[in-house]
């Protein structure tokens, strides 16, 4: 099966400096290769420094927006507040397609500011979110770490402001 060849990446997460576990994702490089490659390379940090002058790497960044029952958003490694980030292709890149849907918990999708504004920000769903279909590119799925995702959700608020610092302390690719 082609599924065995899909890349896998991980985030090691800490809450207020305390290790909380690992999130492992498979990336749908067969359906959205450009989007999956952007995320994979940002997990490894292999592309060096971006146009912002910051490393193209999720390590050390945090989840700046967590809403229980909805999603956890992160990936802004340039500003840290949800207003920054950049892709490995430059600042932003176009929506690749909307083939994959937001069907349940653990869906990995691109956060954006409208059509064709993908950078480095992403979100992980806590439930199905069909209203996002056609507006956000799904490119991965959580395959291990449901307990860690639940810890993230526990630190969310309805406003989205996390109740703790939820940081990606390490990340990378898991070779098959």
Curated annotation (Swiss-Prot):
InterPro entries: Cyclophilin-like_dom_sf (IPR029000), Cyclophilin-type_PPIase (IPR024936), Cyclophilin-type_PPIase_CS (IPR020892), Cyclophilin-type_PPIase_dom (IPR002130)
Pfam families hit by this protein: Pro_isomerase
Annotated source species: Rhizopus delemar (strain RA 99-880 / ATCC MYA-4621 / FGSC 9543 / NRRL 43880) (Mucormycosis agent)
Entry similarity comment: Belongs to the cyclophilin-type PPIase family.
BP term (GO), one: protein folding
The protein, known as: Peptidyl-prolyl cis-trans isomerase cyp5
Functional description taken from the UniProt entry: PPIases accelerate the folding of proteins. It catalyzes the cis-trans isomerization of proline imidic peptide bonds in oligopeptides.
Disulphide connectivity of cysteines: none
Catalytic activity: [protein]-peptidylproline (omega=180) = [protein]-peptidylproline (omega=0)
PANTHER family named among the record's database cross-references: PEPTIDYL-PROLYL CIS-TRANS ISOMERASE (PTHR11071), PEPTIDYL-PROLYL CIS-TRANS ISOMERASE D-RELATED (PTHR11071:SF561)
EC number: 5.2.1.8
Domain PPIase cyclophilin-type: start-end pairs: 10-173
GO molecular function, one term: peptidyl-prolyl cis-trans isomerase activity
Keyword Isomerase included in the entry's annotation: yes
A cellular-component GO term for this protein: cytoplasm
The protein's enzyme class: isomerase
Keywords for the protein's UniProt record, in alphabetical order: Isomerase, Rotamase
Keyword Signal: no
Lineage: Eukaryota, Fungi, Fungi incertae sedis, Mucoromycota, Mucoromycotina
């Amino acid at each position: 099966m082609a599924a065995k060849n899909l890349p896998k990446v991980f985030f090691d997460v800490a809450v207020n400096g305390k290790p909380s576990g690992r999130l492992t994702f498979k990336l749908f490089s067969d359906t959205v290769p450009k989007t999956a490659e952007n995320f994979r390379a940002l997990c490894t940090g292999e592309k060096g420094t971006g146009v912002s002058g910051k490393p193209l790497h999720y390590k050390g960044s945090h989840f700046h927006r967590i809403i229980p029952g909805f999603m956890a958003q992160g990936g802004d490694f340039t500003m840290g507040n949800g207003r920054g980030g950049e892709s490995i292709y430059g600042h932003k890149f176009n929506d690749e397609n909307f083939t994959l849907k937001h069907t349940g918990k653990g869906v990995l999708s691109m956060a954006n500011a409208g059509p064709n504004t993908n950078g480095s920000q992403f979100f992980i769903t806590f439930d199905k979110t069909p209203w996002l279909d056609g507006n956000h590119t799904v490119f991965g799925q959580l395959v291990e770490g449901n307990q860690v995702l639940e810890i993230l959700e526990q630190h969310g608020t309805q406003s989205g402001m996390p109740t703790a610092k939820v940081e990606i302390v390490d990340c990378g690719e898991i070779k098959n």
